[in-house]
Regions:
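Charged, low-complexity interaction regions
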Residues: 19-31, 50-53, 73-83
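Short, solvent-exposed, charged loop/turn and helix-capping segments
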Residues: 40-60
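Long, hydrophobic, amphipathic alpha-helical segments used as structural scaffolds
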Residues: 21-25, 49-56, 94, 98-105
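Short, charged, amphipathic alpha-helical segments
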Residues: 8, 28-39, 58-59, 84-88
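Helix-centric, low-specificity signal for extended rod-like, repetitive segments
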Residues: 2-5, 9, 14, 61, ...
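Amphipathic alpha-helical binding modules
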Residues: 65-105
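Short terminal alpha-helical segments
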Residues: 1-35, 94
Length: 105
């Protein structure tokens, strides 16, 4: 079962995530869109191969979502720190899924 299409999407959005450094409205919109693409792709991969991707779906996806929610509810002074935590959690999970998709081939 090939995962090249999904891996290509994840690699593309992974480079976008690493370029985000500061919290502002534009970066927030970009990272929110990236999160939506990431979560959609993880669900597709889990449905294609539950054995390989269920761990990501059950563990890493909720972890990234918690970081996203922490950013959403944080006070103005904490937003930059929570943005960086969200970005790092998303980036780490993206890299994990990319590696898994290569191994699951």
């Amino acid at each position: 079962m090939g995962y090249a299409k999904e891996r290509g999407k994840l690699e593309k959005i992974s480079t976008k995530v690493s370029a985000l450094t500061n919290y502002d409205d534009k970066s927030l919109a970009i990272i929110t869109d990236i999160y939506e693409q990431y979560s959609h792709t993880v669900r597709i991969l889990k449905n294609k191969n539950p054995e390989a991707f269920e761990g990501v779906y059950l563990n890493e996806l909720p972890e990234v979502k918690l970081a996203k929610n922490a950013l959403k509810v944080s006070e103005e002074a904490e937003r930059q720190d929570n943005f960086i935590k969200f970005r790092d959690a998303l980036s780490a999970s993206l890299n994990s899924v990319i590696t898994l998709s290569k191994e699951a081939q």
